[in-house]
Amino acid sequence: MRKFLLTVCCLGMFGSAFGQSKLDLKSLMELNKLRNTSIPTYNARTRSLEQPKTIPTNIMAMVELKDQNNRADLEAQGIKVLRVRDNIAIALIPLADVERIANLKCVRRMQLPRRLYQKMNLVRKEVGVDKIHQGTDLPQAYTGKGVVTAVVDGGVDPNHINFFKEDGTSRFAYVGKIVENKRNNNGYQYDKYYPRTVLDTMTQANNAHALETFKTDDDESVHGTHTLGIMAGGYKGNITYGEAVGTYQAKSVTGANPFYGSATESELIASCGDLNDSYIALGIDDAIEYAKTSGPSPKPCVINLSLGSNIGVHDSTSVMNKYLSKQGKEAIICVAAGNEGEKPIALKKTFATAGETVKTFLTPTDISPVDEGGTTYYNFRNGQIAAYSKDSTVFEFYINVVDIKQDNRTILSIAVPNNLNGRDVTYASKAKYVNNSNDVNKDFAKAFEGYVSVSSAIDSETNRYYAFAEVMTGDNQTTNQDEDYKLTLEIKSKKAGQSVEVYTDDQNIYFDDNDEDGFVKGSTNGSISDMACATNIITVGSYNVRNRIASLDGSIYNFNGLSTGESFPIGEISSFSSFGTLGDGRNLPHVCAPGAAVISSVNTYAVKNKDLDYEDDQLQGKLKKGKDTYYWHQSIGTSMATPVVAGGVALWLEANPSLTVKDVLRIIQQTARKDNFVTSTGDPVQWGAGKFDAYEGLKQVLKEKQTNGINGVRTTESKDAPIITKAGDRTFNLFLASAKQLNVRVFTPSGQLVHSLSAQGNEYNLNASSWNKGVYLIQVNGNKAQRIIIY
């Protein structure tokens, strides 16, 4: 199941506090939210608004320095620097001092935390992992030995049996938990949990605890346990699971667990807790550092990020995306494309003339009521909107209140202020939503409960003009009970040929024409997560491999309830899979993998949480072992597809630890399958290179390693020497990189020719099943013969 989390940031900036700021508009609005406890914030888990209780002393921020040597300048200001990667630092900033630090000469830009959202048996067979585990036509089997596999996620249960070795000990190196803690002077709490055998050997153990005592970071989420299980879960013992016995019925059977993952013998790391980009970057850094320093030589590392946010410029230039790009040079990082592929949350327009407009309705995604104290919000609109010009040319940007019964007449227009410094304009229904009571507007209150805020600036990195809006409204149930008043977005060009890109975060808003003339729908091209637009990462979309779920209650379900019809057609692109054509010309995702539906291990503490109401109809596997019970459950999303790729890549890294992200991406694109579904369903951009093929990719890795060696050291005499590898009991793979045709001759040691053949291409599978036992010499295209032995 997909779970979409919502957020809301407060508005109403302190007008006198900001000059030309190096903080982006989202950070400015987030700063005001952190400083104000009167404005309710949205809790997506409970679908209710809550009142903040405390103001943090410090906040973790990402600071882009003008030079990597500026760390000392930052520390001279009393700032605690936690990490530096090239010229980007993760630092603790006093909340009262954010603007001053941002405007230091040594600082280029600063970004405050952005909340990110969590976005197998059939799967292993589909992508060829079963063949890899069995060593089919390979020199050996691969299971991820010697590779570090990590997730940054929430809902992690590291003591699930899926993450134990056969001897019952943990495969985890450590689990890191980072959470906001306003009572802590740092503003956060970072604890690490190690297996007790490791903890007992540590001389310094500040904030270090025994892994065996860890339960979970979040008993309302199964997400992180599920994604890690897909990537690297290794339990293969018996469990009880649902098995179909007809169209509608299932039975419970006991047998070998069919739902284990790909990198079953890899070393595990999880970073969990609160999911904002500063914490996520810190968790990634620590996983990379562990992989580099925990052994006699650096270990290859794969990191799965089934997280994202749609708000942002959708290129590689944000501080977070630049930091992620730098991290991608030291680990293979796989990022989910997003689950908004069906949502029109992007809008792109090139204006033919100056003064031309584009208008769209801001439509709520979910119309069910949301409560806070004594206030109920109906037709709840909650989210952020960002609009970007192609260059520094400004455009007019309005959030309008219109009356649909009066031919969409605008009764109130909220326009960006005539400044470029981030100072906002806010309209609110009540004083509790704002710092300045002058922002309360009776016409706005007639239509809505809540507030709208808009601002604009020039992006200091790209020199692009952009406008930003925060929206949190519910329909006034006295004067807008009939829903006659609506919110719209309007953009007006300043010159012919001007282009704009507009994105909303899809937390509770999408762009729609409302079947009204003069308004436009949004586009699904552009639904890609902003974080997935970084360079030096692998971005993953989803396709369907399972649409009927055999559950432990004896029934078979699809995603419309009991299995009575087709949903998520097998082999086709998952309709929810996000995608986008970026302004820099890139199409994302890079590739798709099975994401609907995938069965994997889930957080025991979430299943046992009575508020979540997990029953056997939602569970596909169960194991009771002593006093503990472990569970397996289906879920869908690019969150599930991404660890399929990450786990497959871990197997490649076992075969060749020297692979870079460029190598991995190239091999993914070369070996991806392009079947009829890829060419006939979904948007071509949505598919990327096609369907991820771990098996064919591994074969390519082995070929390139044998041909080119590791770090440039060749394992054969020349690039044109043939590569002969054992592919089975009496089969051999012959490969000659430069050949268009293979001419193969087989001799006895005495020089007698016993076999000869020709084959088109540079690869051939030689079947020697009928040959007598003995030693043979194989010559390919006249090269030096190589010896094989038939047993």
Feature locations, PLM:
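Substrate-binding/access-modulating region of protease and related hydrolase catalytic domains
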Residues: 273-351, 369, 374, 379-395, ...
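Autoinhibitory N-terminal propeptides
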Residues: 4-6, 17-139, 148
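C-terminal outer-membrane/trafficking sorting elements
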Residues: 713-791
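Subtilisin-like serine protease catalytic core
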Residues: 136-279, 298-299, 328, 341-345, ...
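N-terminal domain-start motif of subtilase-like serine proteases
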Residues: 28-55, 97, 118-168, 205-222, ...
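C-terminal subdomain of the subtilisin-like protease fold in secreted/lumenal serine endopeptidases
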Residues: 48-51, 248, 294, 300-309, ...
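Active-site core segment of subtilase-fold serine proteases
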Residues: 156-229, 237-249, 261, 405-509, ...
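Hydrolase catalytic cores
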Residues: 228, 236, 269-274, 285-302, ...
